[in-house]
Amino acid sequence: AKGPIKGFWIEAGYVTKNRGQDKPGNQIFAPNGFRRFFGLKKGKSSSTHIGEIAFETETGPLVTKNYRENDNGMEKLTLPKPEDHGFGVYDGKVLVFEPKGKRFLLTVVELDDFERVYGHRLANVSRMTGGRRFGELT
């Protein structure tokens, strides 16, 4: 082991245009169980709502977004609107989440930079069915 887990990450891949064709998308599918990284538990009823996540970013407002179960056995993570936080788009980038008290600091990194910046901290890397990778940071 490389030490305690200090964060986690997921490759965004293609992001659906859930806000309309003219705006960058802000929802990604995460693997079943990804909620545990956020300290969330599976919903008790038939509701798809799992909980809320409070995000902090380097620029832009604090934002709280929903986390849901999806009917395809995956989980749906709604992120802050990328244009409000200097991220441009999420497509093809890596989303890094680091706990800060009750919030999560969201950093968005180009795929090429991710290995260089975080490569030495990667732990428990897994791959989703569609090929996107996710894992933890030490």
Model-derived regions, located:
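Intrinsically disordered, charged low-complexity linkers and terminal tails
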Residues: A1-T138
